[in-house]
UniProtKB/Swiss-Prot annotation:
It comes from Rickettsia rickettsii (strain Sheila Smith). One of its GO terms (molecular function) is structural constituent of ribosome. Binds 23S rRNA and is also seen to make contacts with the A and possibly P site tRNAs. It comes from the Bacteria. InterPro entries: Ribosomal_uL16 (IPR047873), Ribosomal_uL16_bact-type (IPR000114), Ribosomal_uL16_CS (IPR020798), Ribosomal_uL16_dom (IPR016180), Ribosomal_uL16_sf (IPR036920). Signal peptide: none annotated. Keywords: Ribonucleoprotein, Ribosomal protein, RNA-binding, rRNA-binding, tRNA-binding. This is Large ribosomal subunit protein uL16. Pfam families: Ribosomal_L16. Belongs to the universal ribosomal protein uL16 family. GO terms for cellular component: cytosolic large ribosomal subunit. CDD domains: Ribosomal_L16_L10e. The keyword rRNA-binding applies. PANTHER family: 50S/60S RIBOSOMAL PROTEIN L16 (PTHR12220), LARGE RIBOSOMAL SUBUNIT PROTEIN UL16M (PTHR12220:SF13).
Length: 136
């Protein structure tokens, strides 16, 4: 799974997702991409599940790029623990995805295979998405 090698701080604020993405809104590598419509927090496990679903559909043909990286530590308190007594320990990493952000890109497979792979990947993500093409 994706995780940063080093962090400046162990714990992060919950934060909010910014209005719309300022960067990463156009296709940079592939011919087809998966663009977010909503703003939400996507975990490293969800990114990995989307990657596995897409590559399995592509049958290891072509190339897949992941354009987002989980760099925000998310902390949780253990189950059945009362409120207070400090913040919980970091459990996993996530990325705050803004609306309009390209998350996955595909190149080197037929159009119907690429569209199916991106549909399967989008089913694993908590955000609403749309598929974009290079010539749009």
């Amino acid at each position: 799974m994706l995780a940063p090698k080093k962090q400046k701080f162990r714990k992060a604020h919950k934060g909010r997702v910014a209005s719309t993405a300022k960067a990463g809104t156009t296709l940079a590598f592939g011919s087809f991409g998966l663009k977010s419509i909503d703003g939400w927090r996507v975990t490293a496990r969800q990114i990995e599940a989307g990657r596995k679903a897409a590559t399995r559909c592509m049958k290891r043909q072509g190339r897949l790029w992941i354009r987002i990286f989980p760099d925000v530590p998310v902390s949780q308190k253990p189950a059945e623990v009362r409120m207070g007594k400090g913040k919980g320990s970091p459990e996993f990493f996530a990325v705050r995805v803004s609306p309009g952000r390209i998350m996955f890109e595909i190149e080197g497979v037929e159009e119907n295979v690429a569209l199916r792979a991106l549909e399967l990947a989008s089913a694993k993500l908590p955000v609403r998405t749309r598929i974009v093409r290079r010539y749009e």
